[in-house]
Structures are given as C-alpha cells and as structure tokens.
C-alpha cells in the first residue's frame, strides 16, 4: 500500500491539523477540545458511585485506545475536576504540556528503567496526596479482537499495589466500544500499520457510542490474596462481569470464583 493511499484512508491531513493544534494546549484543554469535537453518545450507568472528592482509582478496561481516555474524561468531568491519567509516556514526549493531566508510564518492558519507574511512582504519590482521581487502564494495551469478540489484555498489578499502598478506593469502570474494521484489518497485518491508525481511530469516532458502567466501589481491604490472583480477578470483573451484572460487588464476584474452583 503506497503512502498517499494510506494517508488518504487515515485522513492524515485532518489528523495532522488537529495534532498541531493540540501542541498549543495544555492536557486539560486538549481533552476538553477533543471531547467537544467528538461528542460521544455516552450511555452512562452508576455515575452516582463515583465519589465527588477524595483519592481514588478508576480502573477501566481498554477497548479502543485514545478514545477511551477522552470518553472517560467526558464522563468524569461531570463529577470531578481533578482527574489525571496513567498514560503512555509518549504522550508527554510529544507534548510536555500534558503533564497537568498525564502521569507518564512506560508500559513496554524494553523502555523501562528503575529511574523511570521511580518517577512514575513519585508523580502518582503526589496525585494521591492531593486527593485526586487517578484513572488507570491497567492493561496498557488495547483489547484484541478474537473470534468477533474483544478480549482484554493481561493487567499489570500496579493498580492493586497502588490501591493498597495509597489506601485508595477503586471505582471499577466497564467500557464498551469498538474500533473500525480498518483498524482490526491493519492489526491482523502487522503492529506498525495498527499503531499508525490509532489517532485516526480517535478522530473517526465523532458521535460514536460508548457505554460506561461504574461498579460498586472496592475498598483496599477487599484486595486480599496474591497480587497476581487479585489483579486477574479484577481484570475479569471489570472487563466482562461488570458489563453484564453492574450491581455485583467485586467481593461477591470473587466468591463465585471460589465456589466454581
């Protein structure tokens, strides 16, 4: 596929203009601009479960990529004005002004270092000390399409570790949305084609539907057991169970796993 054809498919000119405009804005201004431009059709359930103040972690599944962050921002700003995101460090490398809303994380193992990890934890500690709302997509990667269904990737245990260390309540959030067929076609071909479509996948979602379901809050005291086991249970609860049974608590869900085991 030639570059001109690819650029035409991906609306490169429009994407470039938007990216250049965002370079002049702070993170919060950028999120507001994108939320206004995209005007998602949001189907929100359980927003009253989100505390209006105090430190907390919103732990969400990751179906589409950048659009997930904008959709969550659009929902949370109805209740909170202090939201920050754990997000790929590339966002801050592209625009250093995003530090007002992004705690940079190196999700890829080959990009990590002890110094970068310490800096991420330092910034997270500051956010919790300021009693902020911290959003984490613990997979760090988009869900995969398998046999026509989206499968959430494995979660990093950071979300559980932070909740315990910072004594932060977790608000589970199930998101339901899809990318375009073009994205999934490219994703099957190779990772490079998949990755260059991500900004296009954000901008092509104008007036698209997002379902956002908040589950009952999870206390750090509910996160008993090994970090690996708790993280896996939390992933399955948020990505799958919560979308089907929005009123089930995490503790009740874990009890069913014990009974089945």
Question: What do the predicted segments below correspond to?
Answer:
Residues 1-59, 69-71, 78-80, 252-261:
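Membrane-anchoring hydrophobic helices of lipid-metabolizing enzymes
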Residues 9-13, 57-113:
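Catalytic core of membrane glycerolipid acyltransferases/transacylases, capturing the structured
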Residues 24, 40, 113-118, 152-153:
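A conditional alpha-helix N-cap/helix-loop micro-motif detector
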Residues 32-36, 94, 202-205:
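Short, conserved catalytic or adaptor-binding loops enriched in Gly and charged residues
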Residues 41-47, 88-91, 120-127:
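Short, charged beta->alpha transition segments
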Residues 49, 90-92, 109, 177-179, ...:
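Residue-level detector of flexible, active-site-proximal loop/helix-junction positions
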Residues 52-53, 94, 145, 181:
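Short secondary-structure boundary/hinge segments and terminal tails
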Residues 117-261:
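Non-catalytic C-terminal accessory region of glycerolipid acyltransferases
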């Amino acid at each position: 596929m030639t570059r001109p054809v690819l650029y035409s498919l991906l609306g490169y000119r429009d994407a470039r203009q938007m990216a250049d405009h965002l370079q002049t804005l702070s993170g919060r201004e950028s999120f507001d601009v994108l939320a206004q431009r995209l005007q998602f059709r949001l189907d929100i359930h359980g927003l009253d479960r989100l505390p209006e103040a105090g430190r907390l972690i919103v732990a969400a599944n990751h179906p589409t990529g950048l659009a997930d962050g904008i959709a969550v921002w659009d929902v949370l700003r109805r209740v909170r004005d202090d939201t920050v995101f754990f997000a790929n460090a590339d966002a801050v490398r592209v625009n250093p002004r995003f530090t007002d809303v992004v705690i940079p994380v190196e999700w890829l193992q080959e990009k990590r270092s002890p110094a970068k990890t310490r800096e991420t934890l330092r910034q997270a500690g500051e956010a919790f000390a300021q009693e902020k709302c911290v959003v984490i997509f613990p997979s760090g990667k988009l869900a995969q399409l398998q046999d026509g269904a989206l499968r959430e990737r494995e979660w990093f245990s950071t979300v559980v570790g932070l909740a315990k260390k910072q004594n932060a309540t977790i608000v589970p959030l199930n998101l339901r949305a899809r990318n375009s067929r073009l994205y999934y076609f490219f994703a099957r071909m190779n990772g490079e084609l998949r990755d260059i479509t991500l900004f296009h996948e954000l901008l092509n979602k104008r007036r698209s539907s997002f379902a956002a379901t908040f589950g009952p809050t999870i206390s750090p005291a509910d996160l008993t057991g090994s970090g690996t086991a708790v993280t896996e249970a939390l992933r399955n609860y948020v990505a799958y169970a919560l979308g089907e049974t929005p009123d089930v608590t995490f503790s009740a869900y874990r009890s069913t796993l014990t009974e089945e085991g």
